[in-house]
Amino acid sequence: MRLPSGGIQTTGGGTTNATNLTVETNGNSSAAIRSDRGGGTVNVEKGTYTSKGYNSPAVYSTANITVKNAALTAENSEALVVEGKNSITLENCDVSGSMSDSKGTSSSENVHNVMIYQSMSGDAETGTANFSMTGGKLTSSNGDQFYVTNTDCNITLSGVTLVNKDKDGKLLRVTGNSASHGWGTAGKNGAQVTFTADAQTMEGDMEVDSISTLDLTLKNNSTFTGTIQIVDNADGGTAVENNAVVTIEKGSKWVLTGDCTITSLTNNGTIDFNGHTITLADGTVLKG
């Protein structure tokens, strides 16, 4: 059995500072930058950090990890993972991931580039996760750009270039899971996401299942081109309220590429309907 390892590894609440390193890992379950039980703080400035194995993100966080002005590449894995009450903060980084359809530990559940979740293994304290990226580029070669399950989290993007090479991949998927990996109880393991686009341009579809919630805010001249859909939980879980709440602040825009279903809408900006509709939870159908 191969135990998880990392190029830069922090455990037990320690603090690690690294500057302008070249780090490469080749084994499976070997993130280039990772933390383990006990949390801690990791600060990385500049450099190149590459993982080549399966189940080996460029960054796996069970701590508070900040990376600035660096290149982060996962050649056979999702790029980034946040587990539990922890965080990843990126500034002006070039990030790319290429998760396998079959060889990733969670490939049977979802293929993605950034995963935010609670594993229930005891590796990470339960609580609200945080992911923030300012500037730089985030490239996904396969699957969804963001996948969130069995946790609460805040996602903030500002001035990031987003690229998804998989035409079928979602920009964001917020759902429960089958619990086959121990991530909560099927039908009760949805996610709660607060997503803020701040001076951000983004394109792609968002999907939220009926046991999960999304609170999306577009601010500071952000533009979102895509759809939002509420879908049934695959395991028949009891639906919750406020599955998809959207706020568009002054100067920001939502460009629809298809019909949408959301719970409620506060619009002080602009919506380009392009012939499509938005259906609210109370049955109201909005048209251009």
Regions found by a protein language model. Name each.
Residues 1, 5-28, 34-54, 59-76, ...:
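Surface-exposed loop/turn motifs in large extracellular/passenger domains
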Residues 98, 212, 233-235, 263-266, ...:
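A short local loop/turn or secondary-structure capping micro-motif enriched for an aromatic residue
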Residues 172, 271, 286-288:
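Generic recognition of long tandem-repeat/solenoid scaffolds
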Residues 224, 259, 275-287:
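Extracellular, surface-exposed repeat architectures
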Residues 240-246, 254-266, 279-281:
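Surface-exposed loop/turn positions within long extracellular repeat scaffolds
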